[in-house]
């Protein structure tokens, strides 16, 4: 299909079919991404041991922080490209592509280099003990050395979705997971590289996928393609990218702060095994969170295009449909957590103590899952239409304004259970706030129209 025709369909095709067309590939891609992280942890937990799982959990803040910088560029660029395509401003969209590549190179190299210089002190601050530090260090040395490739890979995937190529983005992710699993088998099972093997598998698979992505954008027949003159940073484009990307940046940066605090509270009230239990519970929860993130990625170009084209009824239909779908997804996750937590934990470890702690963590952490999907879609909606302040507030409220104080207070009264209970409590408050803000916004929006 002609690229311009595919883009125009964002404003004409039935919303349900359009959301399925864009969201399903993104959901598959994001679920695949979460699965290959889980597979890494399964290999590490079953082959290396429970302390390696705890060491890997210590590295979560690094992943959140890297994702924060990646989202600031990738999400900001993809949203801006979608709006420009809706406005038929193809030249600006192409320049954003080039600026995205330059920004990812700068951010990826700077982040990886700085973190490598201060790796051990940072890991100690993140909650690493003498037992878990060697595992966390071995993993992050490799991940940070290849960080620039990760930034480029995720950034280009975001641009592919914005450029009406959701299936290509899905293929890139599925290719990455397949290669990652294959390399896990070689590096961990056959060559016995341990936790470093998992890190090498991750980076190498992303490098190979990035090469394929870049090849796609060298095709001059594409609506967006690489050419001279688009890589030089332009202040107005960078401002647009960062102003929209600041919301997901803050959300991921806050997640980094929260995970650091969680890890330290877990070590204080439950020891290294509690950190491992959180790593397992978080892995299960992230499967369903990534489902909704994939749904949001599919919604983003549709909502962004129709907002830019002033087709507001279509924009709202896709938002409502996304909320209903997100609730159904998270309800499925809740059912799994309530009725099959043992089987979830057993995938990662055979250690009875770690399994017991993981079951409790899974039960409590995922308690409010049926509600939290709506909050995620609402936050993404405000980001899609450029309501940066509202999106930032909703991003901050769930993690920083609600969860952080609860983590500081509840464990002093309820010990390790207080750490677990802080998470669903903050989820519930965040949902109430997000729904209230959305209803107020819709009333005002209808009056202005």
Where are these regions (language model features)?
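Residue-level signal for transmembrane alpha-helical positions in Major Facilitator Superfamily
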Residues: 20, 36, 40, 73, ...
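Residue-level signal for short hydrophobic patches within transmembrane helices
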Residues: 12, 16-35, 39, 62-69, ...
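Short alpha-helical transmembrane segments in multi-pass integral membrane proteins
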Residues: 1-23, 81-146, 190-245, 303-368, ...
């Amino acid at each position: 299909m002609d690229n311009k025709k595919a883009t125009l369909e964002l404003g004409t095709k039935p919303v349900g079919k359009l959301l399925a067309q864009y969201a399903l590939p993104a959901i598959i891609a994001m679920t695949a991404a979460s699965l290959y992280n889980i597979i890494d942890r399964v290999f590490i937990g079953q082959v290396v041991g429970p302390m390696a799982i705890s060491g890997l959990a210590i590295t979560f803040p690094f992943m959140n922080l890297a994702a924060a910088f990646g989202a600031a560029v990738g999400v900001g660029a993809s949203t801006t490209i979608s709006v420009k395509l809706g406005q038929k401003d193809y030249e600006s969209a192409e320049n954003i592509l080039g600026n995205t590549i330059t920004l990812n190179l700068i951010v990826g190299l700077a982040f990886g280099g700085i973190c490598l210089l201060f790796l051990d002190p940072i890991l100690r601050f993140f909650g690493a003990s003498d037992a878990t530090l060697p595992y966390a260090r071995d993993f992050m040395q490799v991940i940070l050395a290849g960080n620039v490739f990760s930034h480029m890979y995720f950034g280009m995937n975001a641009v592919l979705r914005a450029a009406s190529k959701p299936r290509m983005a899905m293929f890139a992710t599925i290719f990455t997971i397949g290669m990652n699993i294959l390399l896990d088998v070689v590096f961990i099972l056959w060559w016995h590289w341990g936790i470093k093997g998992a890190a090498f598998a991750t980076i190498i698979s992303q490098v190979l996928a990035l090469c394929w992505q870049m090849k796609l954008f060298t095709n001059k027949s594409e609506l967006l393609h690489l050419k001279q003159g688009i890589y030089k940073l332009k202040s107005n484009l960078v401002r647009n990218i960062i102003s929209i990307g600041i919301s997901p940046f803050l959300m991921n940066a806050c997640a980094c702060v929260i995970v650091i605090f969680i890890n330290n509270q877990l070590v204080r009230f439950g020891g290294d095994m509690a950190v491992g239990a959180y790593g397992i519970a978080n892995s299960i929860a992230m499967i369903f969170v990534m489902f909704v993130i994939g749904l949001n990625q599919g919604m983003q170009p549709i909502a962004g295009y129709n907002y830019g084209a002033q087709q507001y009824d279509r924009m709202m239909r896709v938002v409502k449909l996304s909320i209903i779908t997100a609730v159904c997804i998270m309800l499925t996750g809740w059912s799994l957590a309530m009725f099959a937590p043992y089987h979830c934990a057993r995938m990662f470890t055979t250690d009875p103590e770690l399994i017991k702690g993981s079951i409790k963590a899974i039960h409590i952490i995922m308690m409010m899952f049926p509600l939290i999907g709506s909050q995620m879609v609402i936050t993404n909606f405000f980001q899609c239409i450029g309501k940066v302040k509202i999106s930032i507030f909703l991003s901050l409220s769930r993690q920083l304004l609600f969860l952080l104080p609860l983590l500081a207070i509840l464990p002093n009264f309820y010990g390790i259970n207080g750490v677990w209970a802080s998470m669903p409590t903050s989820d519930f408050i965040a949902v109430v706030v997000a729904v209230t803000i959305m209803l107020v916004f819709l009333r005002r929006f209808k009056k202005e129209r």
